[in-house]
Amino acid sequence: VCIPPQVCPALSDERRTDLWGNADNFVNTMNHFMASMLTPSLQVAMNELSNHDHSRFLTRTNHIVGRVAQLGSKAAEEGINLAVMREAVAVQMTWVGAPTVYYGDEAGVCGFTDPDSRRTYPWGQENRELVEFHKEMIRIHKREKPLRTGSLKMLSWSSNVLAYARFQEGEQIIVVLNNSKELKEVTIPVWQAEVPMKGKMERLMYSWEKSYTTERDIYLVEDGETVVNMGKHSVLIMKPVREMQVDEYGKESSSN
């Protein structure tokens, strides 16, 4: 059966350079389509970066559009950007929905659209750093309740930059992305996600052009905002620091 691209965009080879780094388009598009779904449906919708009908996401990071029959399989592996791939995985694991990894994405499998996207799993030749990054992001997703059932709020966006929050019942996760080739200083109005006006945020994950880290770092919140310096093609995931308090009866409680 021949399905026209207008019906199934996954089969399209369209190249839209005008949308590269267009955060306005991303925010408006996501808001538009998410508004058509009820919350229970959104929470179980599969968040996929790749599938059997589309080119592999890692291949899409090289901005080469085409088919394996014309370009050859090697072209799908040239000029790929693992930092952009990690950005995408971070969004996949922190967005509303059920993160769904197409086999091999976690191992660095490349490929143009079907049939090239169905390459075999690279046993013994996996990109181990990418595999470990997926494991870390899965741990964060499983550990942080707002990432599973929390609300979503866009906090700030501009060309190549996006910050959003997942939050519920006094818990917040803040995600910041810089998808540009430049260093960026980003001011985030975290108060909009019910983060206290003054306090601290702790880093859970930071990925940049060279690698990633889960080492803890602290960011100050002043007047409901926090300022972060973002590297090239980077993503930062953080949450408020909860200070333990002891009441007059010796009972501990946490607060931001």
Residue ranges, per PLM feature:
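Carbohydrate-interacting/catalytic domains
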Residues: N81-L82, T94-V101, A107-N256
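Conserved alpha/beta catalytic core and glycan-binding cleft of carbohydrate-active enzymes
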Residues: V1-D114, K142, L152, S156-S159, ...
